[in-house]
Design a protein with these regions (language model features):
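Non-catalytic cap/lid and distal C-terminal segments of serine-dependent acyl enzymes
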Residues: 1-361
Length: 361
């Protein structure tokens, strides 16, 4: 601004040029400041370990969706709601390529949790228009915090990853059930029930399984049911398998964690856990596996040294459960905390979960 004042009397053209230069300088300084902030956040949270991983993630709708996705609540159109009232479900507007199955939207009201939310279901190739999924195995698919359930299907490209495995007979046909995890936005539920808070655990462990069995006609809960998730959903998946092995015979945590991650977004959960040691224990996957182990543990724990959010927590969990059977680590190099990493891990994860599921229908 001092340059502008000293030049003020030297002609309009000079003033315009200097003003433009000042404006450009301000814009550039803001861009550099934002770039620096992004680099600091990326350094601390490990979204993109390399420039190439950043370039690969550019195809995502929002590569930061696991932790920064604005809540959409999975809003449904009037036409979709009309179809659901008539036949119980509506086809999603965005479908996978032909031959890769079909996405269906449902609205589920949980009696025990008091929650009503969207559930997306993927019907495998050959079962797209079946009245139900009689006898098929089930995989629950759980997304991250603040990422609406719609992202679980589309950003993960779930159908495009799962369908080729079925066609090549590497895994049996199965139904993917994708319930809304974020049932009380903007509060992060941590998949936990607690007094005065949302009954998020009951929604996932009781209501949605009961609905899936009744509505979809799938095989009964047990060895042929499994659950996978990433980030927050990875914690939920690990906890559901450890605490509900009679429902979920196997589980997979992709760059998740293994005990509640409490902060300003989790409401009163931190104080509740501090006052209630029993709830704190029931929410700790390592404690559950050490003290109340399933008859048969089958848990996959995927992480990457490049992921600052999950690597240390996963190593701590593996150390705390060392010697316990049925826990399989999966290390992926240079995998940031992005949909790109979870997409790439999906084929190996599904093969792990469905290896012994078999196919009956």
């Amino acid at each position: 601004m001092l340059v502008y004042r000293r030049s003020a009397g030297r002609g309009t053209g000079r003033r315009v040029a200097v003003s433009a230069g000042v404006a450009v300088s301000i814009v550039l300084s803001q861009v550099l400041a934002i770039r620096g902030l992004v680099l600091v956040v990326n350094r601390d949270f490990g979204f993109f370990p390399t420039w190439s991983s950043l370039a690969a993630a550019s195809e995502d709708d929002n590569p930061f969706a696991a932790v920064a996705q604005p809540a959409s609540g999975g809003a449904m159109t009037t036409d979709e709601l009309k179809q659901i009232r008539v036949r119980g479900w509506a086809p999603r507007k965005v479908q996978p390529p032909k031959g890769d199955g079909l996405y269906r939207d449902y609205v589920v009201s949980g009696v025990q949790s008091g929650t009503t939310a969207k559930v997306v279901v993927w019907m495998p190739p050959g079962h797209e228009h079946a009245a139900n999924a009689k006898g098929l195995p089930v995989v629950f698919v759980l997304g991250g915090a603040y990422g609406p359930v719609d992202n679980v299907a589309t950003s993960l490209q779930f159908a495009q990853k799962a369908a080729p495995l079925i066609r090549s007979k590497q895994i049996p046909p199965f139904v993917a059930v994708m319930p809304e995890v974020n049932i009380k936005l903007p509060q992060d539920t941590e998949c936990t029930d607690y007094p005065g808070g949302p009954q998020a655990y009951t929604w996932l462990a009781r209501d949605v399984p009961a609905w899936a069995q009744h509505t979809l006609g799938v095989v009964q809960p047990g060895p042929r049911w499994s659950v996978l998730g990433w980030s927050l959903g990875g914690y939920c998946a690990a906890k559901l398998h450890a605490a509900e092995p009679q429902t979920f015979g196997s589980g997979a945590s992709l760059q998740g964690y293994f005990a509640p991650s409490v902060d300003g977004s989790t409401g009163t959960l931190a104080s509740v856990l501090q006052r209630d040691p029993a709830l704190r224990q029931r929410s700790d996957v390592a404690w559950l596996l050490r003290n109340r182990p399933p008859a048969r543990t089958r848990l996959l724990a995927m992480s990457s040294p490049a992921d600052a959010q999950s690597w240390q927590l996963t190593q701590q969990f593996l150390g705390a459960t060392k010697g316990l059977p049925g826990i399989t680590p999966m290390v992926v190099d240079n995998a940031g905390h992005t949909y790109t990493a979870w997409r790439e891990a999906l084929p190996r994860t599904l093969t792990f979960l469905l290896k012994d599921a078999g196919a009956k229908g």
